[in-house]
Amino acid sequence: MEEGCRPASTTDLPRIAELTRAVIEELSPMRGGAVWKAREARPEPLEDGLAALLDNADARVLVATIDGTIVGYAVVRLEYLADGSILGVIDDIFVEEGARQVGLGELMIDDLMTWCEERKCVGMDAMALPGHRATKNFFEESGFTARQLVMHHHFGS
């Protein structure tokens, strides 16, 4: 079994869109998932938004593969801050359930970190839903620490 990651191409867009739909389906029922879906999840048509990222010099889109088959993807973008510094923001990082725990997430995060460091980012941010312990642990094992908690008050039933 050969694992790897590489920059995405336009021919990968249908598969990345399929994986994006899978992550939206996986996260939506979790605590905080409904608001995440409405606010942060990629909107349809997914292929159009992903294609724009491929053409954006301030973004990097990766695919993770096992034996040449795409089983994951990641997206990071540069955010220019008020003080003139640059922050790398991981918008997506996802590996299909059956392909987890073999190091693909680590390959992608390492690539994204290198890419952001080369662009003189002061750091990187990533989001994990409350209670999604596996995601939190993954980021912590990669050297991330919490820097902000978002509090939410829901109205209605």
Label for each model-derived stretch:
Residues 109, 116-127:
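Conserved GNAT acetyl-CoA-binding A-motif
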Residues 3, 7-11, 18-31, 37-85, ...:
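Acetyl-CoA-dependent GNAT
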Residues 92-95, 101-114, 137, 141:
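Conserved acetyl-CoA-binding loop-helix of GNAT-fold acetyltransferases
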Residues 106, 118, 130-148:
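Conserved active-site alpha-helix within GNAT-family acetyltransferase domains
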Residues 85, 103, 134:
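Residues that form or flank phosphate/diphosphate-binding pockets in enzymes
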Residues 100, 126-135, 152-154:
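Conserved beta-strand-loop-alpha-helix junction that forms the acyl-donor binding cleft
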Residues 22-25, 114, 118:
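A generic structural signal for well-ordered alpha-helical segments enriched in polar/charged residues
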Residues 15, 89, 134:
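Amphipathic alpha-helical recognition patches that constitute DNA-binding helices
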